[in-house]
C-alpha cells in the first residue's frame, strides 16, 4: 500500500492517478490543523453570538429561511445526511469511492468548511482501513454539489447504510466499522453540509475518464504507427517542420510521438522509400493534426480537473480571518461538466480515426494487403466483421459525445434552477472509453496481421515490441476462427496499459 502525506490543495495528477489505481494510506500534514481549527472556532462564535448563517443554523435549499434552534443542530446534520442519501443504481467500485473520499478530505482540509479535524480524520480512517461506502452511481445533477453520492459516503461515518472492507461483501456500515476497529461519529453544526456539498463525485468521475483518455491516446498513437507501417504509409507527414510552422502545441507533440515510434531502422519503411505514391489517405497522413487536437483537449481538461481536485467547493464558506461566512456557488460543477464534454470529444475522435485506419487496411487497393487481411478470401472472411464491430463502437460514441453541460433541469422547487449535469458527463466517459478500447483492439490485431503479411520485413524496435506483445496472446490469423476471444485478449492488454508504456506520459 502506498503512503501519502496530504498537503491540502497540492495534489498532482500523478498522485490522483495513484489514489484511483491503488489502495493508499493517508496522513494529513500537520500544517493544515490550524486553519481547520480556526474555521471551527468561527462557526462556534457565530452560534455563541446568536447570528443566523446559512447551513449552520438554518434549513437548506428552499428551506434556507427557516431558523433552526440550538438544541436541534446535531439532529439537523444527521437528518441532512439521511434524507439526502437518495441515490440509485449500482454502487461505485472501490477505486472510485476511494478517490471521492480523498478529494473530499483534500477540500475539507483547506480550512474553509467549519468541520472538525476529528471528522476529517474519521474519513481518513475509512480510506486507510480500506472501507468502501455503498455509493450508488446515479442521483446527482452536479449542483448543489454531489449531494446524493456524498450523503451515501457520509452515511458510513454515522454507522448507517452499507459498506464493505477491502473488496469483501457488503455489510451494514456498523459491522464494517467494527471489523476495522472504527466507531460511528456524531456531526456538529455545519459538518453534515460540509460533507455533502462539493463536486468531489463529479470530479472523480471525470478524472477516471481523463485517465482513460490519456491511456487511449497513447495506445492509439502506437496503433496508428503500426498501421502506417502495415499499409506502407509515408513518414514524411510526421516531419517536425510541418508541425512547427502551424504552431499548435498538441500537434507538435503528437508528431514527435509518432517519430519516436517510426524510426529509420524499419526495414518496412526502407522497402518503399522511393515508391511513386504521392500522398496517403487522411487517416494516415493527418494523424498528428487529429491526435494533436485530441491531446490539446485532454490537456486542457486535465488542467481544469486538477484545479477542481484541489478546490474548496463547499457552501457556505468560512473565512475565519474575517470572522465571516459567505454563501456562494462553488458547488456548481459546470467547469467539470465542460471538461468532461471535451474529454468525450477526444475519446470519440480517437476511436473514429482508428476505425478509418482499420477500414483502410481492409481495402486491398489502399493497403496493398490481401482483402480483409486473410489469404484464400471467399472461403475465409478474415477481419470483415471485426471492422464492422469497430464501426459500431465508433458510431455509438458519436451519440455519447453529445455535450451534457448544455443540459439543465431545475431542482429544489426552482431554488436550484440551473445545474451542470457533470456526474452524467463524467460517467458516460467510461462507456466511451470501453468502446474506443474495443476499436483500438481491432486495429492492433489488424495492424499486426498486416505487418505479418509483409513477409521478411520488420518495423522499428518499439513497434516490433508492440507486435510481439500481441503475438504472445494472439496467434497470426491463417484461416477463419472464433474471433471474439482475440479481440478480448487485445482489449485486456490495452486495459493493462501495455502499449501506453511504449510512450512517455502526455499529461505530466
From Swiss-Prot:
InterPro entries (alphabetical): Aromatic_Lyase, Fumarase/histidase_N, HutH, L-Aspartase-like, Phe/His_NH3-lyase_AS
In-chain residues carrying the UniProt-annotated modification 2,3-didehydroalanine (Ser): 144
PTM remark: Contains an active site 4-methylidene-imidazol-5-one (MIO), which is formed autocatalytically by cyclization and dehydration of residues Ala-Ser-Gly.
UniProtKB keywords: Cytoplasm, Histidine metabolism, Lyase
Reaction catalysed by this enzyme: L-histidine = trans-urocanate + NH4(+)
Primary location group: cytoplasm
GO cellular component, one term: cytoplasm
EC number: 4.3.1.3
Any Pfam family hit: Lyase_aromatic
Gene3D superfamilies from the UniProt entry: Fumarase/aspartase (Central domain), Fumarase/aspartase (N-terminal domain)
Pathway(s) annotated for this protein in UniProt: Amino-acid degradation; L-histidine degradation into L-glutamate; N-formimidoyl-L-glutamate from L-histidine: step 1/3
Localization of this protein: Cytoplasm
Recorded superkingdom: Bacteria
Cross-link (5-imidazolinone (Ala-Gly)): 143-145
Enzyme class: lyase
UniProt-listed PROSITE patterns: PAL_HISTIDASE (PS00488)
GO molecular function terms attached to this record: histidine ammonia-lyase activity
Entry similarity comment: Belongs to the PAL/histidase family.
NCBIfam families tied to this protein: hutH, PRK09367.1
Listed name of the protein: Histidine ammonia-lyase
Organism (species): Klebsiella pneumoniae subsp. pneumoniae (strain ATCC 700721 / MGH 78578)
Organism lineage: Bacteria, Pseudomonadati, Pseudomonadota, Gammaproteobacteria, Enterobacterales
Gene: hutH
Amino acid at each position: 500500500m502506498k503512503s501519502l502525506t496530504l498537503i491540502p490543495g497540492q495534489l498532482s495528477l500523478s498522485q490522483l492517478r495513484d489514489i484511483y489505481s491503488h489502495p493508499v494510506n493517508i496522513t494529513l500534514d500537520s500544517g493544515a490543523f490550524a486553519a481547520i481549527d480556526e474555521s471551527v472556532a468561527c462557526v462556534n462564535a457565530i452560534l455563541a453570538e446568536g447570528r443566523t448563517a446559512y447551513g449552520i443554523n438554518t434549513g437548506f435549499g428552499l428551506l434556507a429561511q427557516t431558523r433552526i434552534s440550538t438544541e436541534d443542530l446535531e439532529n439537523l446534520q444527521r437528518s441532512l445526511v439521511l434524507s439526502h442519501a437518495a441515490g440509485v443504481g449500482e454502487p461505485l467500485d472501490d477505486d472510485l469511492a476511494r478517490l471521492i473520499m480523498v478529494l473530499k478530505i483534500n477540500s475539507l482540509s483547506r480550512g474553509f468548511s467549519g468541520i472538525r479535524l476529528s471528522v476529517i480524520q474519521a474519513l481518513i480512517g475509512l480510506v486507510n482501513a480500506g472501507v468502501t461506502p455503498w455509493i450508488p452511481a446515479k442521483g446527482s445533477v452536479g449542483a448543489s454539489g454531489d449531494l446524493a453520492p456524498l450523503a451515501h459516503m457520509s452515511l458510513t461515518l454515522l454507522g448507517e447504510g452499507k459498506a464493505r472492507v477491502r473488496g469483501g461483501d457488503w455489510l451494514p456500515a456498523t459491522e464494517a466499522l467494527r471489523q476495522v476497529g472504527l466507531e460511528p461519529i456524531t456531526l456538529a453544526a455545519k459538518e453534515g453540509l460540509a460533507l455533502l456539498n462539493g463536486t468531489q463525485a463529479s470530479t472523480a468521475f471525470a478524472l477516471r475518464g481523463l485517465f482513460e483518455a490519456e491511456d487511449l491516446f497513447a495506445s492509439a498513437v502506437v496503433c496508428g504507427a503500426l498501421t502506417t507501417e502495415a499499409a506502407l504509409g509515408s513518414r514524411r507527414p510526421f516531419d517536425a517542420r510541418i508541425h512547427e510552422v502551424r504552431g499548435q502545441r498538441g500537434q507538435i507533440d503528437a508528431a514527435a510521438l509518432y517519430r519516436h515510434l517510426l524510426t529509420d531502422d524499419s526495414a518496412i519503411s526502407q522497402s518503399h522509400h522511393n515508391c511513386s505514391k504521392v500522398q496517403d489517405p487522411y487517416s494516415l497522413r493527418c494523424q498528428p493534426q487529429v491526435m494533436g487536437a485530441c491531446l490539446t483537449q485532454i490537456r486542457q481538461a486535465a488542467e481544469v480537473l486538477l484545479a477542481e481536485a484541489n478546490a474548496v467547493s463547499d457552501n457556505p464558506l468560512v473565512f475565519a480571518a474575517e470572522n465571516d461566512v459567505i454563501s456562494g456557488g462553488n458547488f456548481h460543477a459546470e467547469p467539470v461538466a465542460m471538461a468532461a464534454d471535451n474529454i468525450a470529444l477526444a475519446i470519440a475522435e480517437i476511436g473514429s480515426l482508428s476505425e478509418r485506419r482499420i477500414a483502410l487496411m481492409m481495402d486491398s487497393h489502399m493497403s496493398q494487403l490481401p482483402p480483409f487481411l486473410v489469404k484464400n478470401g471467399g472461403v475465409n472472411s478474415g477481419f470483415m466483421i471485426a471492422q464492422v464491430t469497430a464501426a459500431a463502437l465508433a458510431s455509438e460514441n458519436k451519440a455519447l459525445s453529445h455535450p451534457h453541460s448544455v443540459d439543465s433541469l431545475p431542482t429544489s422547487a426552482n431554488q436550484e434552477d440551473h445545474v451542470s449535469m457533470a456526474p452524467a458527463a463524467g460517467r458516460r466517459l467510461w462507456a466511451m472509453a470501453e468502446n474506443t478500447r474495443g476499436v483500438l483492439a481491432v486495429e492492433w490485431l489488424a495492424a499486426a496481421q498486416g505487418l505479418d503479411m509483409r513477409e521478411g520485413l520488420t518495423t522499428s524496435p518499439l513497434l516490433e515490441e508492440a507486435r510481439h506483445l500481441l503475438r504472445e496472446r494472439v496467434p497470426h490469423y491463417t484461416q477463419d476462427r472464433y474471433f471474439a476471444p482475440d479481440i478480448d485478449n487485445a482489449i485486456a492488454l490495452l486495459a493493462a496499459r501495455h502499449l501506453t508504456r511504449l510512450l512517455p506520459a502526455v499529461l505530466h
